[in-house]
Regions:
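HAD-like aspartate-dependent phosphatase fold
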Residues: 1-121
Length: 121
């Protein structure tokens, strides 16, 4: 089983910033995002959406996910925002973490070898 933490804006729908929150309810899903995420859920994986949207936008976000039939098990609001293209997230955990940078195409995951950051020996 995998636990997926999936961003919303720019990953499963149009890239809308908090400053344009009036557009959250009319965002369009990105092609194949729902199908792929729902497939993972139906395979027994856990789906959490992890978004930089603010807590005050929880209800409109939940409604959007429901209206567009995204299977999910939870919604985490308030992810720290990367304000520049050069910014990146670094997640440190005592469990295995796999990072996937969404690059505009949804589909099955494939295994590749990459150079990663790690602590010393």
């Amino acid at each position: 089983m995998k636990i997926f933490l999936i961003d919303i804006d720019g990953t499963v729908c149009d890239d809308i910033k908090n400053e344009d929150s009036h557009l959250f309810s009319v965002a369009m899903p990105i092609e194949n995002s729902r199908e792929q995420i729902n497939k993972w859920a139906q395979e027994g994986n856990i789906i959490f959406f992890f978004t930089a949207r603010e807590e005050e936008h929880r209800e409109v976000t939940k409604k959007w996910l429901e209206d567009h039939n995204f299977i999910h098990h939870g919604l985490i609001m308030g992810k720290p925002r990367c304000l520049n293209q050069e910014d990146e997230y670094v997640w440190i955990d005592n469990r295995k973490v796999r990072g996937i940078t969404y690059n505009s195409i949804w589909g099955d995951l494939k295994e590749v070898e990459k150079k990663i950051l790690t602590f010393g020996d």
